[in-house]
Amino acid sequence: LYEEAMKKGVDVNELVIDALIKALNLDPETTAKARLELATKHLNEGRDLIDKDPAQASEKLYKAAEEVVKALAAHFNLELLQRVGERGRWTVAELERAVEEISERVGSWFVDSWDHAWALHVWGFHEAKLDARAVGLRAPYVERMVREARRLTAAE
């Protein structure tokens, strides 16, 4: 099953997290913390891959940023979570909307950081056009997203 899921581009970790959140009916803060654990895992894996495999590093770093967006959407209990829950998955448009709403609360740096993560996803992973240097230049933006999200969820 795992290999079949990977062939079809299904993120098994994401699938498991989503299923557990739904099955256990987790509260927003527990959901945020679980997503931040996954974000930290992706961040660490991404950092480790920058010099070895920039394309995979790009995707891991993007996934870290994506999990931060989902974590903070839960933390701030954004209204769009209802639509996401009904559909059972996030769309790119909903991720973008969540980024905008989160940015209104935490500052414009969040949109800037997301834009760097999106470049990693598109140009670093899908197009495989970014080398280790280019990925390394963008990694600190994702690191800030993870660090600040952990701070925000611990403080509030």
Regions of interest found by a model, annotated:
Residues 31, 49, 53-57, 127-130, ...:
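Non-transmembrane, amphipathic alpha-helical segments
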Residues 17-27, 47-51, 98:
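Short, charged, low-complexity loops and linkers
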Residues 73-156:
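Long, charged low-complexity segments
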Residues 1, 8-21:
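Short amphipathic alpha-helical segments
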Residues 37-44, 63-70, 115-118, 144-147:
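Generic structural signal for well-ordered, non-membrane alpha-helices
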Residues 26-48:
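Short, positively charged interaction helices/loops
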Residues 54-76:
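Hydrophobic alpha-helical packing segments in soluble, helical-rich domains
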